[in-house]
């Protein structure tokens, strides 16, 4: 599938992705997938650009795979949010007009939200001094953004080191803090649809939810309103801190969050070894009816996959349908697919986000 931005080809490309997902899930008797499309442009809420010197000036640049010495200079980026496209020329004019901002600048990162927040990270091959900080303060004020300066071993924050997102799920607005440098869903509109699908698939439950790989609480917040109690795990300290803030900010008080990997939690549930991070949490007090997983591209490792088998319901969000199919193959003797969906997080690429609800046979 072409990675070229061409809205006229969008519908055909989405149909091809849906056909591929049907093909991968057909051996498991999957129902027809729900298909959630993306805006055709301005859908990507974050972007990262290297800078390239040409004509005595630094320009935004991207590179084709395997061609890191052949820059493609760009002035706008139609797949990025309108806020990013509005900021790009203003930021470029600012560094071109101020040597304190321009000197040894090599990379720019944007993070925006559907709520209108924006953060810009400027990366340098030099130490950041007071003159840079003064220029960055003025820049932040003029552009109405937070500015993060990064150089080797140092980070300078002008404003906040996070952006704020608001997402509407089933009639309720959830507020999320998205830290600089941490993972966030890039396509906000599709993320909102994906959360709505997961919320509906979860259903109203009177038992408990186990969530693996919870990140900043993207799914945790809405799903917690559908369960009695939630035990959520995440390994990234930055994401854990953001998730704890987001739970408190949204008044969600039925979630315990622990910094464990999925593999470590498997050991804890199987009573292989105790974990200090689980002190005060009685795993046997939970009545888990559903496990929610959103693993990395490699999918669930075999032990985690076996762990999920003990649950009546498995709600699985996947960024790689190939490994999703491999995991389902491991589970198909005990679970069947009740519903499935395609979420077009990454238009004009071959990448697919999908979801399945597996229930015990």
Curated annotation (Swiss-Prot):
It catalyses: uridine(54) in tRNA + S-adenosyl-L-methionine = 5-methyluridine(54) in tRNA + S-adenosyl-L-homocysteine + H(+); uridine(341) in tmRNA + S-adenosyl-L-methionine = 5-methyluridine(341) in tmRNA + S-adenosyl-L-homocysteine + H(+). Pfam families: tRNA_U5-meth_tr. Keywords: Methyltransferase, S-adenosyl-L-methionine, Transferase, tRNA processing. The gene is trmA. It is an enzyme of class 2 (transferase). Dual-specificity methyltransferase that catalyzes the formation of 5-methyluridine at position 54 (m5U54) in all tRNAs, and that of position 341 (m5U341) in tmRNA (transfer-mRNA). It comes from the Bacteria. GO terms for biological process: tRNA methylation. S-adenosyl-L-methionine binds at residues 185, 213, 218, 234, 294. The active site is at residues 319, 353. GO terms for molecular function: rRNA binding; tRNA (uracil(54)-C5)-methyltransferase activity, S-adenosyl methionine-dependent; tRNA binding. PROSITE patterns: SAM_MT_RNA_M5U, TRMA_1, TRMA_2. The keyword Transferase applies. Its EC number is 2.1.1.-, 2.1.1.35. NCBIfam families: trmA_only. The keyword S-adenosyl-L-methionine applies. Belongs to the class I-like SAM-binding methyltransferase superfamily. RNA M5U methyltransferase family. TrmA subfamily. It comes from Pseudomonas entomophila (strain L48). This is tRNA/tmRNA (uracil-C(5))-methyltransferase. GO terms for cellular component: cytosol.
């Amino acid at each position: 599938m072409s990675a070229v931005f061409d809205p006229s080809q969008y519908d055909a490309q989405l149909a091809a992705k849906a056909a591929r997902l049907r093909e991968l899930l057909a051996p498991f008797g999957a129902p027809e997938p729900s298909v959630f499309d993306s805006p055709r442009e301005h859908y990507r809420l974050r972007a990262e650009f290297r800078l390239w010197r040409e004509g005595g000036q630094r320009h935004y640049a991207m590179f084709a795979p395997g061609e890191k010495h052949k820059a493609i200079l760009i002035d706008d980026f139609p797949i990025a949010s309108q806020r990013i496209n509005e900021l790009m020329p203003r930021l470029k004019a600012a560094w071109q007009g101020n040597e304190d901002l321009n000197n040894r600048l090599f990379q720019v990162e944007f993070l925006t939200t559907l709520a209108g927040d924006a953060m810009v990270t400027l990366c340098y091959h030099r130490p950041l001094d007071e003159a840079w900080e003064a220029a960055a303060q003025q820049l932040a004020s003029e552009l109405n953004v937070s500015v993060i300066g990064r150089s080797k071993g140092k980070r300078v924050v002008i404003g906040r080191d996070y952006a704020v997102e608001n997402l509407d799920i089933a009639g309720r607005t959830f507020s999320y803090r998205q830290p600089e440098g941490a993972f966030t869903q890039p396509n906000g509109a599709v993320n909102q649809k994906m959360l709505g699908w997961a919320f509906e698939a979860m259903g109203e439950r009177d038992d408990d939810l186990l969530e693996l790989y919870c990140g900043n609480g993207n799914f945790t917040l809405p799903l917690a309103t559908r369960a009695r109690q939630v035990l959520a795990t995440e390994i990234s300290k930055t994401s854990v801190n953001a998730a704890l803030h987001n739970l408190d900010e949204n008044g969600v008080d039925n979630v315990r969050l622990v910094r464990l990997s999925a593999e470590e939690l498997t050991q804890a549930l199987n009573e292989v070894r105790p974990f200090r991070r689980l002190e005060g949490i009685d795993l046997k007090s939970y009545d888990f009816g559903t496990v929610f997983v959103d693993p990395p591209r490699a999918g669930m490792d075999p032990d985690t996959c076996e762990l999920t088998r003990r649950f009546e319901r498995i709600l699985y969000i996947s960024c790689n349908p190939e490994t999703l199919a491999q995991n389902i193959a491991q589970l198909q003797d005990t679970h069947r697919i009740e519903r499935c969906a395609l979420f077009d997080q990454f238009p004009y690429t071959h990448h697919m986000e999908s979801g399945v609800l597996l229930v015990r046979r």
